[in-house]
Regions:
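Metal-dependent DNA replication initiation modules
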Residues: 1-3, 9, 17-18, 64-65, ...
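Signature for HUH/AEP ssDNA processing cores
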Residues: 1-113, 122, 194, 206-208, ...
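Modules that initiate DNA replication and primer synthesis
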Residues: 9, 14-17, 24-25, 114, ...
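Charged, low-complexity surface segments at secondary-structure and domain boundaries
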Residues: 40-48, 76-78, 154-165, 217-218, ...
Length: 261
């Protein structure tokens, strides 16, 4: 793990430690009760602690040798393809030329069966549900990098390794979709199948943090997972907060509230 962490840093991929997986359990204090095992930061400020300093990275790895590696997105933009739904959404957007271009940039398979496509950084917001199962991770967001361990027992793994494939520019056609001003999410469906109607929530011009923090607590009390809550708050923030909070602020709200649930 250390060798890969040092490679990422040497090649300009800003990283920070995320909690790891040991014996099918998160290394955080919640252990097997963690609702986002192996995916959340093991530093106080999360992506803001990301570093390219090999000394810092060695220190992190020595402190928690089981830590996963998290990429602080921004200088690198990631297309997050969530399982079969995401694959189908992406395929519906592709022609032969687009598909061929995507095959030239680094790609990793996630431990949960999805994919991450890595591109040169571009000015674009973090987007949850740009299309069903398709998210964009940019500044303020993060993804877990190979060879980190997933709760499934599988490791994240590159099938197009950045040691051989250079980061390509973020596709213009995908950027156009990402910057479309039309609402991208009207409903978020929780894993339980329960829909959250975004349009039923009034516009939040002020007290955004308090409103989203209150909603976050309600969702935790209803037994929702960190992933569900993050997706819901991101969608509400994008569609109903005027102006929207930074993605890092949403992440901070979720992790702050999660300490009490």
């Amino acid at each position: 793990m250390l060798d890969w962490a040092l490679w990422f840093a040497h090649n300009g991929w800003p990283i920070f430690p995320a909690h790891g997986i040991v014996d099918r359990s998160c290394t955080c204090r919640k252990g097997p009760e963690c609702s986002s095992p192996g995916k959340h930061p093991d530093t106080r400020r999360g992506w803001k602690d990301a570093s390219l300093d090999p000394r810092q990275i060695r220190e992190w790895c020595a402190k928690n040798p089981h830590a996963n590696i998290a990429l602080a997105c921004g200088n690198i933009t990631v297309l997050d393809i969530d399982g079969e739904k995401g694959r189908q959404s992406l395929e519906s957007l592709l022609d032969d030329d687009r598909a061929a271009y995507l095959r030239t940039t680094p790609r990793a398979r996630t431990g949960g069966g999805g994919w991450h496509l890595f591109f040169q950084g571009v000015e674009v917001k973090n987007l949850v549900g740009m299309k069903p199962g398709l998210d964009i991770r940019s500044r303020g967001g993060h993804v877990i990098l190979p060879p980190s361990m997933h709760i499934s027992g599988k490791r994240y793994a590159f099938d197009r390794c950045p040691t051989k494939h250079k980061l390509q520019k973020f596709p213009k056609w995908l950027l156009k979709i990402a910057k479309d001003d039309k609402p991208r999410i009207q409903t978020v469906t929780l894993l339980s199948g329960e829909p959250v109607d975004i349009d039923s929530i009034p516009v939040i011009p002020e007290y955004r943090n308090n409103t989203l923090t209150s909603l976050c607590g309600k969702l935790f009390r209803r037994g929702r997972t960190v992933e569900e809550i993050s997706a819901t708050l991101m969608a509400i923030n994008e569609a109903r907060c005027k102006p929207p909070l930074d993605a890092s602020d949403i992440e901070k709200i979720v992790w702050s509230v999660s300490r009490y649930h």
